[in-house]
A protein has these predicted regions:
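An extended, acidic
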Residues: 1-123
């Protein structure tokens, strides 16, 4: 929990996939308890740019399209952030489930996501 103490995270609600609200809220709660704050800008590209700029430490969201993340993904990677899907792989463009964070907090974020991950989101 030390890695997430004091961190500011960002996310977006799965409004296109409301059937995933229960596991999403469990992920949210699990992270909210450990971090300093969770923000919602409403634009994945902006959240990813904020990770790249160091304004937020990590970001996750369910069900995004590649065009929502492409530019921000490049910025985040160039700044040293790691971009994965919910199981730590590289299928985020196909699954739409993305986690982006600095290396210091990524492992803990993935752990909290996996604890609450239904099989339907583990692809």
């Amino acid at each position: 929990a030390k890695e997430m103490a004091g961190t500011v995270l960002a996310t977006g609600f799965p409004f296109k996939q409301k059937h995933h609200i229960e596991p999403y809220l469990k992920m949210f709660q699990s992270m909210f308890i450990e971090c300093a704050d969770i923000r919602r800008a409403g634009a994945p590209a902006l959240d990813l740019a904020y990770v790249a700029a160091g304004r937020i430490d990590g970001y996750w969201e369910i069900g995004l399209k590649p065009w929502e993340t492409a530019a921000g993904e490049l910025l985040a990677k160039e700044a040293g952030a790691i971009v994965t899907d919910f199981v730590g792989g590289h299928n985020y463009e196909n699954s739409g489930n993305i986690v982006v964070a600095n290396p210091r907090v990524l492992k803990e974020m993935l752990g909290k996501i996996r604890e609450n991950l239904p099989d339907s989101l583990a692809k």
